[in-house]
């Protein structure tokens, strides 16, 4: 992933402005209050230690800084809920087995989405980790959600 990112940064001519770093979400290599904000897209559900990762990202925010998390969620509206469930749990893993050498990746995604705390439950975890003014915005009838919180 980082190798692909480095190639993109080089191609865009951003090597003087962008630094890619590999690290542990629960032990970030940055000083307290370093950032005005952060964004994480479809990655927080993969944290081994969700609360530790959120707390650590909170630590790196400046006072008043905003954390933004985009994650998959489970739609609740008929018939999208049923269509999404069939696609995510049956069709995608089945096609993944046929076309990929890593069939486990296609079953991991729906499993990780099912296990991830969403909605009010995730916002309560954010609050426990120090965020305030937590909000959630559902996208595409609930297939994904954006969570925000302020330090």
Regions found by a protein language model. Name each.
Residues 67-68, 133:
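A short hydrophobic/small-residue beta-strand
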Residues 27-32, 48:
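Short conserved loop adjoining the S-adenosyl-L-methionine
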Residues 14, 74-129, 135:
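C-terminal alpha-helical "lid/dimerization" subdomain adjacent to the S-adenosyl-L-methionine
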Residues 125-151:
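C-terminal lobe and adjacent flexible extensions of AdoMet/dcAdoMet transferase-like proteins
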């Amino acid at each position: 992933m980082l190798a692909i990112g480095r190639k993109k940064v080089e191609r865009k001519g951003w090597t003087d402005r962008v630094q890619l770093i590999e690290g542990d979400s629960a032990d970030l290599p940055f000083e307290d209050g370093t950032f005005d904000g952060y964004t994480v897209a479809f990655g927080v559900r993969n944290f081994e230690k969700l609360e530790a990762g959120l707390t650590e990202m909170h630590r790196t925010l400046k006072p008043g800084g905003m954390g933004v998390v985009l994650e998959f969620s489970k739609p609740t509206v008929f018939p999208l809920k049923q269509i999404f469930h069939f696609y995510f749990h049956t069709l995608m893993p089945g096609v993944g087995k046929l076309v990929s050498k890593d069939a486990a990746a296609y079953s991991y995604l729906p499993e990780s989405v099912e296990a991830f705390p969403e909605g009010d439950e995730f916002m309560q975890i954010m609050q426990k980790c120090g965020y305030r003014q937590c909000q959630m915005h559902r996208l595409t009838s609930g297939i994904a959600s954006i969570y925000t919180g302020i330090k």
